[in-house]
Swiss-Prot record:
It comes from Trichoderma asperellum (strain ATCC 204424 / CBS 433.97 / NBRC 101777). Coiled coil: none annotated. This is Class II hydrophobin 2. Aerial growth, conidiation, and dispersal of filamentous fungi in the environment rely upon a capability of their secreting small amphipathic proteins called hydrophobins (HPBs) with low sequence identity. Class I can self-assemble into an outermost layer of rodlet bundles on aerial cell surfaces, conferring cellular hydrophobicity that supports fungal growth, development and dispersal; whereas Class II form highly ordered films at water-air interfaces through intermolecular interactions but contribute nothing to the rodlet structure. Homodimer. Homodimers further self-assemble to form highly ordered films at water-air interfaces through intermolecular interactions. InterPro entries: Cerato-ulmin_hydrophobin, Hydrophobin_sf. Belongs to the cerato-ulmin hydrophobin family. It comes from the Eukaryota. Keywords: Cell wall, Disulfide bond, Secreted, Signal. Disulfide bonds join 34-74, 45-66, 46-58, 75-86.
Amino acid sequence: MKLYIAAALLTLGLAAPITETESHSIASRGSFSCPGGLINSSPMCCSVNVLGLLALDCRNVGPDGCVGSSKPNCCTLGTAGQGLICNEM
């Protein structure tokens, strides 16, 4: 049963991949937006992304985008400094 849950979460994390050219254009603008819907719709700046399932040290995107060592992520759920099911931009 746990394997099915893990497989479902991994599938959701990979559902909306972003191409390399989109990633560069987003980074050059300094800010980004996430696709609408239920999955990966919350923009966050996170320092660590573990296999697209869990992102650590996350915070909301500031007016200048992500600064320092944090990278832009689109997360399904973000709470208490962590993001769940995140795609790194």
